[in-house]
């Protein structure tokens, strides 16, 4: 981001922009009270929000929507699963990612759903050294060293909500394909299946997916 529009080479394969919402806010489940996302550069006790998420919750879309509602139209997305396992290299990669976010004046969303609990703690500790607002998405049972008011538990979205995701994305993509096993799929997974068929599915999707019921009237 120093004039050439490219990320630091150490994190180029870890980072991506999240600018256009995949799902409108009215199609996302209500998470109840959500911690304040502080303004960029402000001094505060913690700039981190942890979302403990079940699969099929729409967590990434919820995180992006919450940032958008807080005045951040785009965010830098970091996939923690691809961070180096070496502690020193991991630290350098996280710091380089925070630097990219600072240079772009954007908050971050860190997807930590596919890493072990001890790695989650390590990544959060590294992120907490910065004043960049960060939403960290973890698995549902991960214990994190953050104040309770900085933690949000996000359940699996109701069948009617996931049904609305499918209808919305099908209309957006104009795809003749169908998705009949998306009980715990995220909107990103549904979109991938509509675009590429059932043979392509997110690596984070569980193997015990059921069939989505299609209620007549979605309720949120």
Short names for language-model regions:
Residues 76-138:
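Conserved P-loop NTPase "ATPase switch" module shared by AAA+ and STAND
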Residues 1-74, 80-83, 96, 133-220:
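AAA+ P-loop ATPase motor domain of ring mechanoenzymes
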């Amino acid at each position: 981001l120093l004039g050439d529009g490219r990320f630091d080479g150490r994190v180029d394969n870890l980072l991506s922009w999240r600018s256009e919402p995949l799902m409108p806010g009215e199609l996302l489940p209500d998470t109840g009270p959500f911690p304040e996302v502080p303004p960029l550069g402000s001094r505060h006790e913690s700039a981190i929000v942890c979302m403990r998420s079940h699969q099929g919750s729409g967590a990434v879309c919820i995180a992006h929507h919450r940032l958008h509602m807080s005045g951040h139209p785009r965010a830098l997305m970091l996939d923690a699963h691809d961070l180096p396992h070496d502690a020193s290299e991991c630290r350098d990669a996280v710091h380089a990612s925070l630097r990219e976010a600072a240079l772009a004046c954007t908050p971050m969303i860190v997807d930590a759903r596919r890493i072990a609990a001890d790695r989650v703690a390590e990544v959060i500790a590294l992120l907490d050294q910065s004043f960049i607002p960060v939403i960290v998405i973890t698995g549902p049972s991960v214990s994190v060293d953050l104040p309770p008011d900085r933690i949000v538990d996000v359940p699996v979205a109701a069948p009617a909500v996931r049904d609305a995701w499918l209808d919305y994305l099908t209309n957006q993509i104009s795809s003749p394909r169908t998705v009949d096993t998306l009980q715990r799929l995220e909107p990103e997974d549904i979109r991938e299946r509509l675009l590429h068929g059932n043979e392509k599915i997110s690596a984070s999707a569980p193997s015990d997916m059921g069939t989505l019921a299609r209620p007549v009237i979605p309720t949120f």
